[in-house]
Amino acid sequence: MNWVNDSIIQEFILLGFSDRPWLEFPLLVVFLISYTVTIFGNLTIILVSRLDTKLHTPMYFFLTNLSLLDLCYTTCTVPQMLVNLCSIRKVISYRGCVAQLFIFLALGATEYLLLAVMSFDRFVAICRPLHYSVIMHQRLCLQLAAASWVTGFSNSVWLSTLTLQLPLCDPYVIDHFLCEVPALLKLSCVETTANEAELFLVSELFHLIPLTLILISYAFIVRAVLRIQSAEGRQKAFGTCGSHLIVVSLFYSTAVSVYLQPPSPSSKDQGKMVSLFYGIIAPMLNPLIYTLRNKEVKEGFKRLVARVFLIKK
């Protein structure tokens, strides 16, 4: 990649909420707690899913991928935010900004695709239960996960290249907590209409295509569940999908408001808060949603804790 600004720009200033210094300490506390919970929660899901043989199923394989993604998602942004909240001079190096932009875009796109893959897994499990193990074999699961990651990172290469090749005007001040495409486009010295149109188009594709697949999957799932005679069977079927639906709703509702909403000066602070929610709060809530609503994960966690104490004895 030819990052044309690399030899000129050394660093960016991240404004965040610099005009409201009284918010810095509360945000520092919130970010620190959220990051700690995110690390602990997602590591717990990864360990439980990998170490408990009863959870070696496609559903938990994809959940492990989602937890790993959320770990990386927050780690690429939160540590830098914490440092800046504790500093008088809030900066990020040019190379750090490039890395943050690339990783943030890649993981965001990958998450959309993984959520669609997880809905397909639930569709097969509920609508084709007798053929589930045949259809969702290990090789297909690996291929679906790999395709999600590769597509997400390929999309990031494209968008990052388009954004970072634009000439940027001094002062290099980003009115945000992190390096995002919309914030960087505002620094450009040239017309960015074409870039904004491409960003909008790609965002629509990565939002609407996976969302359409999710909605189609759940339309078939709801139809299949309503045919189940017993109330207990219906409750169990809906229970396996409830956590996934909550996560999808959280992620899509916030991400759509950032990338598919037309820019407005009056909504810039709202955009910052929404970005913080889907970049920090949502990855923290995901493991809580899955563990609190999922009996198998809770039982697997208990077995893991019991094994740890047994080894210590």
Swiss-Prot record:
One of its GO terms (molecular function) is olfactory receptor activity. GO terms for biological process: detection of chemical stimulus involved in sensory perception of smell. Belongs to the G-protein coupled receptor 1 family. The chain crosses the membrane at residues 26-49, 58-79, 101-120, 140-158, 196-219, 237-259, 273-292. The lineage of its organism: Eukaryota, Metazoa, Chordata, Craniata, Vertebrata. Odorant receptor. PROSITE patterns: G_PROTEIN_RECEP_F1_1 (PS00237), G_PROTEIN_RECEP_F1_2 (PS50262). Glycans are attached at N5. Disulfide bonds join C97-C189. GO terms for cellular component: plasma membrane. Keywords: Cell membrane, Disulfide bond, G-protein coupled receptor, Glycoprotein, Membrane, Olfaction, Receptor, Sensory transduction, Transducer, Transmembrane, Transmembrane helix. Its main location: membrane. It comes from Homo sapiens (Human). CDD domains: 7tmA_OR2B-like. Residues 1-25, 80-100, 159-195, 260-272 are extracellular. It holds the Pfam family 7tm_4. It comes from the Eukaryota. Signal peptide: none annotated. Residues 50-57, 121-139, 220-236, 293-313 are cytoplasmic. The keyword Transmembrane applies. InterPro entries: GPCR_Rhodpsn (IPR000276), GPCR_Rhodpsn_7TM (IPR017452), Olfact_rcpt (IPR000725). The keyword Membrane applies. It is a multi-pass membrane protein. It is found in: Cell membrane. This is Olfactory receptor 2B6.
